[in-house]
Amino acid sequence: MAYDMVIKGAKAVTPDGVIEADIVVQNGVIAEIGSDIEASGTEIIQADGKYVFPGVIDCHVHFNEPGREDWEGFETGSQMMAAGGCTTYFDMPLNCIPSTVTAEHLLAKAELGRQKSAVDFALWGGLVPGHIEDIRPMAEAGAIGFKAFLSKSGTDEFRSVDERTLLKGMAEIAAAGKILALHAESDAITSYLQMVLANKGKVDADAYAASRPEEAEVEAVYRTIQYAKVTGCPVHFVHISTAKAVRLIREAKQEGLDVSVETCPHYVLFSHDDLRQRGSVAKCAPPLRSRQSKETLIETLIAGDIDMVSSDHSPCRPSLKREDNMFLSWGGISGGQFTLLGMLELALEHQIPFETIAEWTAAAPAKRFGLQKKGRLEAGCDADFVLVSMEPYTVTRESMFAKHKKSIYEGHTFPCSISATYSKGRCVYNDGEKVTEIDGALVVPS
């Protein structure tokens, strides 16, 4: 039988393990996976023993469009994600102007994505003071969930929530059948410590890290779990950086609460030492932790207590990455291209099965957010997959697809590389070359 595409000789990373297989694609969907399939195709791809992973589903990126396209934007951002093996990303509601806090804003943003994105995408709505009544209309317009900050967001347009807004908003999100994504750092702790340190003239990397201690994350997670008990709101804790907070989330799961947690590659690949040595390219919130805390977080991840890994790609204009005052420097790491590669580096260092990496980067987010046709190499799923070569790759400015090249990953050598990425059977990245065809669609739970 003739098909649109047949990938021959792949090491397919399936939920049941890695298998030697051919992958057959028809009409943008995986038609069959198996050994020595007798099928012809319009396009035959010889995988030559490369690993084939399900396309990454990154639940946490900031593309800043509309309004701050000079920071990133859908066009360069989606091409960057494709270069990293990502076939679906969730764009956050802040750093764009206007923030995505009404159904009108969400629908307008979705149309921009359709016009410019190389791969599929979802959109977070925002939970901010004064917009609780907009939650249900945004849910009906296609929001994948709602994002809130307990500490300052970094932009004036997207305000952090007070306790009443958080509680009422969580009740409304629960009623709408959606999920709250929470930036869990205590504003009381972080603002107070920053004031104390800045008043003493301490504004370097050590001062910044000291102003956002693990206790700020733990307090915010604990408080939100209590609100989840009261409201019944499902919660997804984003970019958790400390095992102490993960333990609270694990206990909440054991009590039957509907909670999940992500961490980011930079929290398991880098440490506070990198912020000291590299400066503002390593600034993020929560901050990179000590080497010991990093190792403990890795142990927690390997133990299965963290559901998924997302990039929290948060770029800016290079001029905003100041070195003279770490408090005033933009806090975000540009790294959306390196999630899968970073986790594969971790896998090889710690003997983590590749199917576990596929779970963290694809299957778990698909399951959590109801994307039933994504996240797995299985017949009937979207033909979203990435070919990985076990050839080392050193990140250069020329090989970065993000709009701006100021990144902690510059100069980093990964033990493997992305050879090609396919979204619904279309090649969207091939061996260092971006593919400019636009076919990204807004995805919603199915």
Curated annotation (Swiss-Prot):
Binding locations of Zn(2+) 1: H60, H62, K147, D312
Cofactor note: Binds 2 Zn(2+) ions per subunit.
Maturation and modification: Carboxylation allows a single lysine to coordinate two zinc ions.
UniProt catalytic activity: (S)-allantoin + H2O = allantoate + H(+)
List of residues binding Zn(2+) 2: K147, H183, H239
Keywords linked to the UniProt accession: Hydrolase, Metal-binding, Purine metabolism, Zinc
Assembly behavior: Homotetramer.
Name the UniProt record assigns to this protein: Allantoinase
Species assigned in the record: Bacillus subtilis (strain 168)
Gene encoding the protein: allB
